[in-house]
Every structure is written in structure tokens, then in C-alpha cells.
Amino acid sequence: MKFGIISIFPEMFKAINDFGVTARAIKDSKVSISCFNPRDYTTDRHATVDDTSFGGGAGMVMKYQPLSAAIEDAKNTLGCGTKVVYLSPQGSIFNHRKAQELLQNDSLILLCGRYEGVDERLIQDYVDEEISVGDFVLSGGELPAMLVMDSLIRLIPEVLGNKESVIEDSFYDGLLDYPHYTKPAVLPNGNAVPGVLLSGNHKEIAKWRRKQKLIRTYERRKDLIECLCLSAQDKQILDDYKIDKVSTKGEE
């Protein structure tokens, strides 16, 4: 997969290029990243990429000309039909389903805004989709872009050493992940790993993990549960959990 990054701070993407799973994917030629700095496409000696907002108001707005030139260059590099995604708090919320959808593209151009945002006419002329990583505001689109890239890259076949790592991730099946434990089996304070995980019975371990995924999602993200078509067995697990929870409260 090819990524084109429109950013005035391309150095920030060393975090993607140089570390972890994403760096390995780049080294293995499964991913390529090209950065296009709008400052390189300006026409004035100060390399100005922003200006005051028409109508007044605090903050500066990123200019149309350098951004459009950077996007055009990115399209020439990645392909004229490459989808342009603007990282914006006004966009649709990014989630696992959206990641899977974006993964269908061979290439993506990620536009990272700064200041008060970008000239609206640029969005009208070039942006195919606006995406938000949450209902909060950051200083720029670089961190959201890296978040989106990391999420997509780990879904690319063979990027992760064990394909089960992807399947067992939170949200892969619409549920949160189950609890994980490592050595020692018992901590000095007596806190021990659930016995089923030490049993070697893979069928029982799988049942325990499924139960934990359902309960954890129900407790922490009921909105996710409501969107799923649960099996009769899954529904029974949750019904039993609710009954046990009520009984436990009654005994306190």
C-alpha cells in the first residue's frame, strides 16, 4: 500500500518509518510512504502556507495554492485516482470498519491540517473524505494520520508475524479483546492467572476468552454489543453474567 502525506512537519512521520510493525512493513516493501511538504510548493520567499481568515476571527487558515500543488504532485506520484482523506474533527469517526474499508485502496493521500484548518475551497475541490479520530481537537492532523496508517498497515496480509494477532485484536469481530497474562503465573501479592489458561485445554481456553470478550464489551462498550448479531450461545453467556451480577449485588 502506498501513502502520500501532505504535511508541513514531515519529520514527524519518522515514528512510522523507523519503529515497530510499520517500519518492518516498509522494510519488507509492503508499504511505501512519500511526504509532500506544502512549503516546497509556495511561490514567495518566506514559504508562506497560511494566512488570516476572511471575516475575521482568531487563528490562521492554510492556503489553497500550496496545498493544492502538493496534492497534485502526490497524485502524479501515487496515481491520479488516489483517494484524498483530510484528517479533521468534523469528519466521520474512524473505527475498525472504516480501516477495513480504506484498506481496499492501493494508495491513499492523507492531508494533515494545521492552525484553524484549510481553505474550504480546497476541501471542495480535492478532498474525497474527512475522517476524525475522536471528538477532541489536536494541534494538527499528523498524529491522526499516523494513527490511521498504523491501523491500516497492521491489517495488510503478512505484515504481522502471526495472522491470529489480527483476528484476536479488539474490534476485529466487533468485540473488545479478552484479558492477557504472562509470567509469573502468581504475583508476590498472590494475584494469580485464571486457572483455565494454565490447563492446556484449548477448547476451554477458547470458551473462556470468548466469554471475557463478551463481558468486557458489555461492561465497557454497550454500544458495540447493540450493533452485533450475537449467537444464541453468546446471548446466553451475557444473560447468565447479568443474573450473576444481580445476585452478587444482592449479597453485598
Curated annotation (Swiss-Prot):
Pfam families linked: tRNA_m1G_MT (PF01746)
Membrane is among the record's keywords: no
Assigned EC number: 2.1.1.228
Similarity comment: Belongs to the RNA methyltransferase TrmD family.
Known catalytic reactions: guanosine(37) in tRNA + S-adenosyl-L-methionine = N(1)-methylguanosine(37) in tRNA + S-adenosyl-L-homocysteine + H(+)
EC top class named in words: transferase
InterPro entries for this protein: Alpha/beta_knot_MTases, tRNA_m1G_MeTrfase_C_sf, tRNA_m1G_MeTrfase_TrmD, tRNA_m1G_MTases_N, tRNA_MeTrfase_TRMD/TRM10
Residues that, per the record, bind S-adenosyl-L-methionine: G113, V133, G134, D135, F136, V137, L138
The name this protein goes by in its record: tRNA (guanine-N(1)-)-methyltransferase
Localization annotation: Cytoplasm
Stated role: Specifically methylates guanosine-37 in various tRNAs.
Lineage of the organism: Bacteria, Pseudomonadati, Pseudomonadota, Gammaproteobacteria, Thiotrichales
A single GO cellular-component term on record: cytosol
GO molecular function: tRNA (guanine(37)-N1)-methyltransferase activity
Record keywords, A-Z: Cytoplasm, Methyltransferase, S-adenosyl-L-methionine, Transferase, tRNA processing
Biological processes annotated in GO: tRNA N1-guanine methylation
